[in-house]
Each structure stands twice: as structure tokens, then as C-alpha cells.
Regions:
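Short beta-strand/loop turn elements enriched in aromatics
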Residues: 43-44, 61-71
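Ligand-binding loop in jelly-roll beta-barrel domains
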Residues: 90-91, 104-134
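Short, conserved beta-strand element in jelly-roll/cupin
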Residues: 56-58, 69-84, 123
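Short histidine-centered beta-strand/loop micro-motifs
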Residues: 64-69, 86, 93, 112-114
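A short, N-terminal "cap"/entry segment at the start of jelly-roll beta-barrel domains
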Residues: 1-51, 93, 137-160
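Short acidic-glycine-tyrosine-enriched beta hairpin
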Residues: 45-49, 56-58, 81, 86-106
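N-terminal post-signal-peptidase region of extra-cytosolic proteins
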Residues: 58-61, 70, 107-112
Length: 160
């Protein structure tokens, strides 16, 4: 979906800012950009700040321990593959060119590590942060045990 198709799909109409400057009349800007992710509904804490970071995991790195963010986070995998798991959702692998998002708040983010054992993985993520809250808060073992029933079933290995 192009940016202009997304614009229309979300009822933004035809009026408003046309990008101005060179190329606006040709409409080239409407096809130059490709939508990678459309997440809704999102809740951004009032007075939130935003931070974009670049993360690079070496082969097999499990990533950040279970944690949560105070606001939503939106990511794009540059190279490699991220093992991604949010509370209540099955574990999945997001490959280079793919996106992920999480709502933030109370939801636990279990995994964000490198799914590859032989190559580096890199991604960028933009996180919204509620005022007075840390951008990332680790979840302790007691809370993980208390909320274990909210975690999606774990993948099982086939017998050898």
C-alpha cells in the first residue's frame, strides 16, 4: 500500500498538505514512499517523549530480558531476523524488511533477540515514553511467574 492509498483508506480526504515544493504537482511523492506498518489502535501517553534507537545483536544473542515499555514501540528489521514475542501472542520471527510494534503499558515483551545463530541482526525501534517513567523496565521473576497464564503456549521441538 502506498502512503497516498493509506491516507485515503483512513479517511483523511483529499484536502490538506500536498507536500509542496518540487514534485508536488507530479504526484511522485505518493508512490516514492511505501507503507511498512499500520498499527491501530495505539495509545500514546499524554506528554510522551519519543526515542529512536538502533539495536545490533551478535549471532544467537537472546536480546533484552523480559521487559515492558511505558508507551507504544514501532520497529523495523534492517538485517537478520528478530525473535519477537509479546505477552498473549505466539513467538514469531521478523525477518529483514519486516516490522513489529507493541502497545506498551502493562504488556510484557518477552523476546527481541537474534533468531540467527550465524549472522548479526540489526533493527531500529521508535519508542514512546510516558513522562516520569523509564523507557524500558525489566520484569522480575516473581511477576513473570504471576503472569505465566497470559503467555502464549511455547513452541515445542520435534523429538529427535
Amino acid at each position: 500500500m502506498t502512503v497516498s492509498e493509506n491516507h485515503a483508506a483512513h479517511g483523511h480526504g483529499t484536502g490538506g498538505h500536498d507536500g509542496g515544493g518540487q514534485g508536488a504537482a507530479s504526484g511522485g511523492w505518493t508512490t516514492a514512499a511505501r507503507m511498512l506498518q499500520d498499527a491501530s489502535p495505539i495509545t500514546v501517553p499524554e506528554g510522551a517523549s519519543a526515542m529512536t534507537i538502533h539495536v545490533a545483536w551478535e549471532p544467537g544473542d537472546p536480546g533484552t530480558p523480559p521487559h515492558r515499555h511505558s508507551g507504544p514501540a514501532f520497529g523495523y528489521v534492517i538485517q537478520g531476523a528478530v525473535r519477537f514475542e509479546l505477552e498473549g501472542e505466539p513467538e514469531r520471527v521478523v525477518e529483514a524488511g519486516g516490522t513489529f510494534w507493541e502497545p506498551g503499558g502493562d504488556v510484557i515483551h518477552y523476546q527481541d533477540g537474534n533468531a540467527l545463530g550465524d549472522a548479526r541482526t540489526e533493527f531500529v525501534v521508535t519508542m514512546m515514553c510516558a513522562p516520569g517513567k523509564p523507557m524500558l523496565e525489566l520484569v522480575d521473576e516473581a511477576e513473570l511467574a504471576e503472569r505465566a497464564h497470559l503467555r502464549a503456549p511455547r513452541p515445542t521441538s520435534a523429538p529427535s
